[in-house]
C-alpha cells in the first residue's frame, strides 16, 4: 500500500499547471540568481545541518526548482524519467536535469514529486515573494521535512495516528476537521500563545515559572480536545513547528560559521543571516501575540510549535533525541532552564 505522503504528492500533481511543450518553452540553463541561491543553500546545508540536528546532514537533498517555463532537478537520487540531462554543474556540485514546467512557479512544498523520492519543490525567490536570504532559509526548512519523511517508521507512524478517516490521498494532513471555530479552543490557544511569549522573554529567575505556565496552558488546551484532535494538533506541532524552528536555528548557525559566498552577498536583496535570525524571532513573537485560530486555521499551529521547540532547545539537552524516538508529538518542557 502506497504511503500517505506519496498519495499527497499525487494530489499536488493533479492540480499542477499544464505541461508546456516545445523546445522554445524550455530553458536550457538555470537563471544565474537561482543558481547562486541554490548553491548557497547546498553549501549552507553542508556547514550547519549536522551542527543543528543529529543525522540531518546525511539526508538526500533532491530539489526541483520550478521556473516560469521549465523545471530543474538538482541532485536526483536516481536517473529521472521524463527529464533531459544538463550535466554536472560545478557551482552546485551536483547533476542537473530539466523538463517543461508542470508545477506552479510559486509552490513551496516537499513531497515525492520525482521518482517517489521526497523532493523539495520550490519556485524562485521572486515567484514565492521571498528575499534571497529568506528563500535559502525556507529551502533548509523544506530540507528538514526531507529528514522527517526519511525516518524509518514515518509512514507507518502517520498511519497509526488514525486520522485519515477514509482519505487515501493524504489530503487529511491539510483538511482535518480540527475545531478551529470553537470559542473555548480559540481562547485556550490564545492563552498558550501568550504564555509562550512570556517564556521566550523570561529572565533566568522567572524562567521556571514561565515554563510551568506554558505546560499548564498546553494541558488546558488538551482537555478541550478529543483524542483525535489532540493527536492532529501535536502532529502539526512536531512536523511544521519543528521545521519552522529549523529556520531560526539555521540562521543563527549560519551567522556563526562565516560569511556566505561573495556571489550570494552581491544579490541586491541579500540580508546577513544574523539580521535574519533577529527578524525571525521578532516575527515569531508578533505571530504569537496576534494568533487568530479562526482565521489562520492550521497555520496557527506553526508559531506555537516553533516557540515550544525554541524553549525545548534551551531547557532539554535530550529533546532532539526524544523528538526522533517518539515522533508526532513535541516533548514536554523541562521545569527550568539548563
Please give the residue ranges for each predicted region.
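Catalytic zinc-binding patch centered on the HExxH motif and its immediate surroundings
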Residues: 82, 96-117
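Active-site recognition of the HExxH zinc-binding catalytic motif
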Residues: 137-149
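Bacterial N-terminal signal peptides
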Residues: 9-20
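N-terminal mature-domain "stem" immediately C-terminal to a signal peptide or N-terminal signal-anchor/transmembrane
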Residues: 25-94, 243
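Post-HExxH zinc-binding segment in Zn-dependent metallohydrolases
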Residues: 150-213, 218-222, 229, 233-279
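Short pre-active-site segment immediately N-terminal to the catalytic Zn-binding motif
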Residues: 124-139
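Extended hydrophobic/aromatic segments used for targeting, binding, or gating
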Residues: 254-314
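Non-catalytic terminal regions of proteins
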Residues: 28-50, 94, 281, 292-295, ...
Amino acid at each position: 500500500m502506497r504511503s500517505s505522503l506519496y498519495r499527497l504528492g499525487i494530489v499536488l500533481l493533479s492540480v499542477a499547471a499544464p505541461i508546456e511543450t516545445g523546445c522554445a518553452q524550455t530553458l536550457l540553463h538555470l537563471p544565474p540568481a537561482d543558481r547562486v541561491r541554490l548553491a548557497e543553500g547546498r553549501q549552507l546545508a553542508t556547514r550547519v545541518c549536522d551542527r543543528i540536528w543529529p543525522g540531518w546532514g546525511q539526508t538526500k537533498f533532491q530539489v526541483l526548482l520550478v521556473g516560469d517555463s521549465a523545471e530543474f532537478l538538482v541532485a536526483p537520487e536516481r536517473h529521472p524519467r521524463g527529464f533531459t540531462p544538463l550535466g554536472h554543474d560545478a557551482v552546485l556540485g551536483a547533476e542537473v536535469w530539466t523538463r517543461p514546467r508542470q508545477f506552479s512557479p510559486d509552490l513551496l512544498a516537499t513531497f515525492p514529486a520525482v521518482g517517489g523520492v521526497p523532493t523539495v519543490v520550490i519556485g524562485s525567490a521572486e515567484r514565492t515573494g521571498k528575499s534571497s536570504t529568506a528563500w535559502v532559509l525556507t529551502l533548509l526548512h523544506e530540507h528538514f521535512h526531507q529528514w522527517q519523511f526519511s525516518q524509518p517508521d514515518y509512514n507507518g507512524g502517520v498511519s497509526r495516528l488514525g486520522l485519515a478517516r477514509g482519505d487515501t490521498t493524504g489530503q487529511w494532513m491539510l483538511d482535518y476537521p480540527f475545531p478551529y471555530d470553537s470559542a473555548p479552543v480559540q481562547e485556550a490557544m490564545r492563552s498558550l500563545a501568550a504564555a509562550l511569549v512570556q517564556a521566550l522573554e523570561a529572565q533566568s529567575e522567572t524562567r521556571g515559572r514561565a515554563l510551568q505556565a506554558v505546560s499548564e496552558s498546553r494541558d488546558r488546551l488538551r482537555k478541550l480536545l478529543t483524542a483525535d484532535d489532540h493527536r492532529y494538533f501535536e502532529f502539526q506541532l512536531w512536523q511544521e513547528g519543528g521545521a519552522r524552528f529549523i529556520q531560526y536555528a539555521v540562521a543563527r548557525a549560519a551567522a556563526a560559521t562565516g560569511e556566505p559566498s561573495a556571489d550570494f552577498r552581491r544579490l541586491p536583496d541579500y540580508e546577513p543571516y544574523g539580521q535574519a535570525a533577529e527578524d525571525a524571532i521578532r516575527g515569531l513573537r508578533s505571530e504569537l501575540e496576534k494568533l487568530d485560530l479562526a482565521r489562520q486555521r492550521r497555520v496557527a499551529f506553526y508559531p506555537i510549535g516553533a516557540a515550544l521547540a525554541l524553549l525545548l532547545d534551551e531547557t532539554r539537552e535530550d529533546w532532539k533525541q526524544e523528538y526522533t524516538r517518539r515522533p508526532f508529538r513535541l516533548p514536554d518542557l523541562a521545569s527550568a532552564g539548563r
